Swiss-Prot record:
This is 3-demethoxyubiquinol 3-hydroxylase. It is found in: Cell membrane. It comes from Laribacter hongkongensis (strain HLHK9). InterPro entries: COQ7_proteobact, Ferritin-like, Ferritin-like_SF, Ubq_synth_Coq7. Pathway: Cofactor biosynthesis; ubiquinone biosynthesis.
Length: 206
């Protein structure tokens, strides 16, 4: 038990503080840097910081859910989603650096809250565990579509990253649904949306 706790603690430290790794090529590989105005660059940077913080939250959420999941298929779905979210961390972290910015200072806070939420979701049972996975991914997909609508058209590098992330999130949601996710009650969806809005507004600037 102690070994497992140490492993999970190490995962948390790596997620928040260590450079993330990716097996897949970066989606923006081979694309040229666009000539962005200072305003466009600041906006793209803010959006990529939001996306990076969102992936930190997703890592913590899925880590907590996997800890308490009972069904092996559910655990595997969560682990697969978590690994691809790690790749998203690597992609967004690199893009943030290219745009001359830094990651959100609030990442440790959001990680802790998301981990607690994931553990709670897992304790409710696998169907609700999967419901949280499905709804989280659909909400992330929606906000990535919003980002694609406001990112500068000429910022091909950021747009390629966000597009691949969106496609991955959609696939994760479909997997959760196919595995038997429960129907998430509207009030819970609303609370998740409000929490997401708070994360986006704060991490865009801080």
């Amino acid at each position: 038990m102690l070994d497992k706790l140490i492993i999970e603690f190490d995962k948390g430290l790596r997620t928040v503080f260590a450079p993330a790794q990716t097996l897949r090529p970066h989606p923006d590989t081979g694309l040229e840097e666009a000539g962005l105005s200072d305003l466009e660059k600041r906006h793209a940077l803010g959006l990529m910081r939001v996306n990076h913080c969102g992936e930190v939250c997703a890592q913590a959420l899925y880590q907590g859910q996997a800890l308490t999941a009972r069904d092996p298929a559910t655990r595997e779905a969560l682990k697969e989603a978590a690994w691809e979210e790690t790749e998203h961390l690597a992609w967004t972290e690199k893009r943030i650096a290219e745009l001359g910015g830094r990651k959100s200072l609030l990442n440790p806070l959001w990680y802790g809250g998301s981990l607690a939420m994931g553990i709670t979701a897992g304790l409710l049972g696998d169907r609700w565990n999967l419901a949280f996975l499905e709804e989280t991914e659909y909400q992330v997909e929606a906000h990535l579509n919003e980002h694609l609508a406001t990112l500068p058209e000429q910022d091909a590098k950021s747009r390629a990253i966000v597009t691949q992330m969106r496609d991955d999130e959609h696939r994760h949601a479909e997997t959760a649904h196919a595995l038997g996710a429960a129907a998430m009650p509207a009030p819970v969806k609303g609370l998740m949306h409000l929490t997401s809005q708070l994360m986006k507004k704060t991490s865009y600037h801080i």
